[in-house]
Structure formats: structure tokens, C-alpha cells
């Protein structure tokens, strides 16, 4: 070895040692229990508390730290934690989605999440079992980085969360939403919109100071606009991806999306300025008269000065023009990936099945959880792990080969927007349906427009990257990534109501490499045993013949041809009308018999048939005929 080579090797080793010494283990102990909260001042309700407190703690770590979260489930229902945006490279067992990478953690049990934080930026954590994070189990996760390109450009930092809020527990809302009486799938309307889990709050700032603001939409449904009156800011990060700084004044933040911005305050302290969040009313089927869509909090320069309300109305909000995230350039200037080795094209549809409920579909498949967590199927399947069949039809599995360039084309056959998130990756955003109005988010109100591989916009040379994108109504979106992270990764709509309807599919990435590199900890098996869930076999829990899917969990059957949601509504109300009509006839008949019986009382004693309720009903039936 030459002297120069030896010096380089020693320098690299020293740098690695220095970084290793700086890294630390950060431990959080989470005891989940129900607590009472009233963040909007309108209604008390139960929420998921941690260590008896709500709002929940913001997790803060440095890049390179080991994060350990010891969760004790003191609730009366199952729970998990997903650390949204974490790649979990080599630690797929720590990703958190129930029945994909682990079993749900039953009441009374403990579960430890333990992984190295190899990323930086703005993230969040939330429950990833059926209907739990709208009950308050969600909060920001901030990863500090002393080597961020903008590290020396600010003096202080703050975290801002925005979310929708329901006064009713999801266990009560869910049966109304997934119901024969809601065939069109109208989502529950929130009761309020929160800012840092409260309302009418202030962020105290100093004059002539630059702040790094971490913005996170931790809601379950509604996207929100964000701006600060008479201020601009510089975008420097989206979803954990550093960007070349770009000035903006308004952001559109869907659920699960994040931004970091640099805000430099004014020199004077004579007034305070509204921080405005505006719920996207286009997502709501109706707007209750008491629902406050536009909410004002304050950038507070002077606590003694007035705190003015924002100069915004519902009508004016329709004219807001947010910054287009597709135009951002990652600071690493990663070029467009080469042509894909695999293209996956799917279409979003919202339809009804034979039970009359409204479901969500990707290519006519509504995601249905398997009987065995998918990661465990991979690990127990041997050579058959590369066969998509063993994972079941209704998990909508896509087996990806290691290091393939994958392109997902998502067409939207629905009139609503859908924020889609891919676990385990960020991706290049390379194309989106063209707008049909003055701004990039105005789309055709007519027939859906599908992606045409032979006639599309020019792909950007350096595409923006993030892990959650907004699929436009009746349009399309195209993303591209490298399958370099072996694991089971969920790809799903992050509107929690839509996920409950089945709007998701699964990427089974490099199953052979998973078997070689991953190890399932014993706590996983213990958790499954407590829940009575098998830990081996195919999607139907068949360990003898992995290609036999008999008994797999499946979506309900299809409606007969020609049935529509409107037809279901008509049928339901026709049946109800018929039942009510029969009831009125019965009541009328009984009242008529009673009238005749009363008329005969003066002249003769009551007969046995008149005193016998069964005979009265028989008489009424005879009268009805």
C-alpha cells in the first residue's frame, strides 16, 4: 500500500470514528393510554395519550443516532408505530404497518422499535393499524443535521403541525362511513382544523432573525394551504429531500407531506401577522355552516400588540396559488433515472361491491390484509418468495427485482385528489396531468385523462423527489425510483378513510435479498402469538402448498352489471319505504280492530280473539290482504 493510499484510509477511518463517537442512542418510552382533550375548545373527547399527555411529544434526534421507542400498549385496542418517511434500509421489521411487516400489538403488550436514523429533515410518526391515528396518535419527527446545506443560514427552528380534527371517535365514525347507508363513500367531515394541536395560538419571534420552520400535515383527510401575511420564505426541504432554496409565499400541504422553509423576520416589532391555514374545501362533500375552514394563528413580534384576523374568506381562498412542488430541484442534483425496467400502471376507482359499501380500487383490486404478515410470508417461502401468487390476490402484490428502475403510473378515475405515499423510498416525480385552468392544480371536470406513454410532457432533467405526492382529480401522476431497498413496502393513499376502503397495494422488493439480509426479532413472533396470528405460510396461512390460496381474505363480490351507487341508494330507500309502508298498514289495521272492539264493548263482553295479541295481528294481516 502506498503512503498516499495509507493516509487516505486513515483519514476515512478517523472520519468514521468521529461520526461514530458523535452518534448516540436516543430512547423514548411510550405508555399509550386514553386521555381527554379539547384542543378546539368545542368538545371534550378521548384521544391517545403518551405517558398521560396529549399533544404527543415531538421526537427529535440527530442524523446517525440510534432511535429506540419502547411502546407499551395500554389501550383497549391494537396499535403499532410507523415512522413516516424513514427508509428502514435493513430494518424493514421496524416499519410498522400492521399485517405487512408485523402483527398488531395487542392491548397490554410491549413492543420496541429500534433503528439507526440515516436520514435527516422533517418526518412524523403515527399509528398504522385500522383507524387509530385520527384519534390523536400522530406527531412530528425531526432529524437534525449539522451538515445540511442551509445549516448556517438560520438562528432558531420551530415545528408547525396542521391537521383536521374530529369530535367523534373513529370507532363510531367508521361504521357510518363503511356502510350500506353511505354507498357513495362520503368521507366524514372534520369538526375543526388544528395548528400545533390547538387553535388561535402565537409563535413568538425575534426581529431580524432567520428561523427554520418544519411544516407537517399530520391530518387524516384534508389538505391545507399555508401562508404568513406580508411574509415570504425559502423552501429548503420537502419530505426529507434538501432542495435548492426557492422563494415562495403559499404552500399546499396534503396529509403526510412536509416542508422545511427559512423565514427571516422583519426589523420592526410594532405589529403581529396572521399565520393562515386554509382547508381545501374541494375535498369536502358539504361544508357545515359552523365549520371554520380558514384559521388564523399569529407570528408574534409583540405580545402587547393587536393580533389581527386574517384577511381571507372562503371565496378568496379559491384564488390562492400555491408553489408547485414539481419545480423544485434537489440540492444533490440527482439526474433523471434511466428508462424503467418495470412499469406498473394502475387506475384509482371508487365503486361499490355486493354488500353495497363504497370501496376504493387500484385496477379493480381493493386491498385486503392477508392472514399472515407479508414479510413473514417472504421469509418462510423459500424459492417461491419471488412468486407474486403466494401473497394473495387482494394484497395486490408487485414483486420487484433488486436494483430495478421502477416506474409507477397512477391514473385517477375519481373526481377527488389522493395523496399517495410509498414506504421505504422517496421517488422522482417525473410527470403529472396538464392543468386545465390558470394554475397547476386546476384539472379537467369531465372525462378522466390517462397517461399516454407516447404523448406526454418532457420529463425534467433533474426531477423533484419526495415520498408523498398529490394525484390530481381525473388526471395522472408518474413516479420513478430504484428498487435498492429490500423489504415489504406499502404504496397507498394517505387519506385514512380511503385506505380503509382498500386504496393501496404492496411492493415486495428483492425478496431473495430480504431472506439473505433480514432477521425477524423474537418480539415479532411473541406479538403474533398473543394476537393469534400465524407467522408462516402464504396469504391464506397455508404452509403445505404455498400456491393454494384457498381461504385467503378477499374483498366482497362484485355487484351485478348495471348497478351503480345511485341504484343502491334507490334500492335501499325503496326497501326502507316498503318496510315503513308495511309497518303503517299493520299499525292502521291494529287501530281499526281496536276501534271495532271498543264499539262492541257496550253490547257484549270482549271475545278471546280480541284480547289475544296474536289473533289481533292475524286479523290485521287478513285486513291487509
Where are these regions (language model features)?
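Extracellular/periplasmic metallocenter environments
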Residues: 75-76, 88, 97-155, 251-305, ...
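Alpha-helical transmembrane segments
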Residues: 578-592
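C-terminal substrate/ligand-recognition segments
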Residues: 388-429, 474, 483
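Active/binding-pocket-proximal capping segment
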Residues: 229-242, 413-455, 485, 496-501, ...
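N-terminal, post-signal-peptide metal-ligating segments of extracellular/periplasmic oxidoreductases
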Residues: 16-110, 143, 152-155, 171, ...
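Fungal secretory targeting signals
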Residues: 1-23
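Histidine- and aromatic-rich segments of cupredoxin/plastocyanin-like copper-binding domains
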Residues: 92-99, 103-106, 161-162, 170, ...
Amino acid at each position: 500500500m502506498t503512503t498516499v493510499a495509507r493516509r487516505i484510509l486513515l483519514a476515512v477511518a478517523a472520519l468514521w470514528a468521529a461520526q461514530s463517537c458523535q452518534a448516540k442512542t436516543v430512547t423514548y418510552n411510550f405508555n399509550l393510554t386514553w386521555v381527554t382533550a379539547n384542543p378546539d375548545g368545542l368538545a371534550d373527547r378521548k384521544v391517545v395519550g403518551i405517558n398521560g399527555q396529549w399533544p404527543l411529544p415531538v421526537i427529535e434526534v440527530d442524523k446517525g443516532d440510534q432511535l429506540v421507542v419502547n411502546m407499551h400498549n395500554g389501550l383497549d385496542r391494537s396499535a403499532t408505530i410507523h415512522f413516516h418517511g424513514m427508509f428502514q434500509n435493513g430494518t424493514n421489521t421496524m416499519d410498522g404497518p400492521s399485517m405487512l411487516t408485523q402483527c398488531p400489538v395487542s392491548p397490554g403488550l410491549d413492543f420496541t422499535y429500534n433503528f439507526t436514523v440515516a436520514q435527516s429533515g422533517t418526518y412524523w410518526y403515527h399509528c398504522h393499524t385500522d383507524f387509530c391515528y385520527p384519534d390523536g396518535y400522530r406527531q412530528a419527527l425531526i432529524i437534525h443535521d449539522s451538515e445540511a446545506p442551509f445549516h448556517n443560514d438560520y438562528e432558531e427552528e420551530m415545528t408547525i403541525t396542521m391537521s383536521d380534527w374530529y369530535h367523534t371517535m373513529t370507532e363510531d365514525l367508521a361504521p357510518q362511513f363503511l356502510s350500506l347507508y353511505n354507498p357513495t363513500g362520503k368521507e366524514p367531515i372534520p369538526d375543526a382544523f388544528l395548528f400545533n394541536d390547538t387553535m388561535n395560538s402565537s409563535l413568538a419571534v425575534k426581529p431580524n432573525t432567520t428561523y427554520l420552520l418544519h411544516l407537517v400535515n399530520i391530518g387524516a383527510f384534508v389538505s391545507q394551504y399555508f401562508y404568513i401575511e406580508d411574509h415570504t420564505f425559502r423552501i429548503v426541504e420537502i419530505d426529507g429531500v434538501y432542495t435548492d432554496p426557492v422563494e415562495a409565499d403559499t404552500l399546499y400541504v396534503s396529509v403526510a407531506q412536509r416542508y422545511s422553509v427559512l423565514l427571516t423576520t422583519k426589523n420592526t416589532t410594532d405589529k403581529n401577522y396572521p399565520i393562515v391555514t386554509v382547508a381545501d374545501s374541494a375535498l369536502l362533500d358539504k361544508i357545515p355552516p359552523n365549520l371554520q375552514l380558514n384559521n388564523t394563528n399569529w407570528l408574534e413580534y409583540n405580545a402587547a400588540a393587536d393580533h389581527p384576523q386574517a384577511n381571507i374568506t372562503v371565496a378568496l381562498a379559491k384564488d390562492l396559488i400555491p408553489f408547485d412542488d414539481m419545480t423544485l430541484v434537489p440540492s444533490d442534483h440527482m439526474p433523471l433515472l434511466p428508462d424503467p425496467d418495470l412499469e406498473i400502471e394502475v387506475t384509482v376507482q371508487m365503486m361499490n361491491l355486493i354488500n353495497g359499501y363504497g370501496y376504493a380500487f387500484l385496477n379493480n383490486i381493493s386491498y385486503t390484509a392477508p392472514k399472515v404478515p407479508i414479510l413473514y410470508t417472504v421469509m418462510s417461502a423459500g424459492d417461491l418468495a419471488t412468486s407474486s401468487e403466494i401473497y394473495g390476490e387482494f394484497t395486490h402484490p408487485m414483486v420487484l427485482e433488486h436494483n430495478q428502475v421502477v416506474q409507477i403510473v397512477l391514473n385517477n378515475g375519481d373526481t377527488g385528489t389522493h395523496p399517495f405515499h410509498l414506504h421505504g423510498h422517496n421517488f422522482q416525480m417525473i410527470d403529472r396531468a396538464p392543468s386545465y385552468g390558470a394554475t397547476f392544480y386546476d384539472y379537467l371536470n369531465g372525462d378522466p385523462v390517462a397517461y399516454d406513454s407516447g404523448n406526454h410532457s418532457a420529463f425534467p432533467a433533474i426531477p423533484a423527489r419526495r415520498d408523498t405526492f398529490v394525484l390530481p382529480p381525473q388526471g395522472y401522476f408518474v413516479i420513478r425510483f430504484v428498487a435498492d431497498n429490500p423489504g415489504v413496502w406499502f404504496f397507498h393513499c394517505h387519506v385514512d378513510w380511503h385506505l380503509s376502503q382498500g386504496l393501496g397495494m404492496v411492493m415486495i422488493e428483492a425478496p431473495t435479498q430480504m431472506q439473505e439480509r433480514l432477521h425477524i426479532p423474537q418480539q415479532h413472533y411473541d406479538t403474533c402469538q398473543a394476537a393469534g396470528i400465524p407467522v408462516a405460510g402464504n396469504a391464506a396461512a397455508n404452509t403445505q402448498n404455498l400456491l393454494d390460496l384457498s381461504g385467503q381474505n378477499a374483498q366482497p363480490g362484485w355487484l351485478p352489471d348495471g348497478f351503480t351507487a345511485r341504484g343502491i341508494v334507490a334500492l335501499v330507500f325503496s326497501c326502507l319505504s316498503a318496510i315503513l309502508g308495511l309497518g303503517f298498514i299493520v299499525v292502521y289495521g291494529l287501530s281499526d280492530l281496536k276501534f271495532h272492539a271498543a264499539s262492541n264493548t257496550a253490547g257484549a263482553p270482549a271475545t278471546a280473539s280480541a284480547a289475544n295479541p296474536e289473533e289481533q295481528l292475524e286479523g290485521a294481516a287478513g285486513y291487509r290482504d
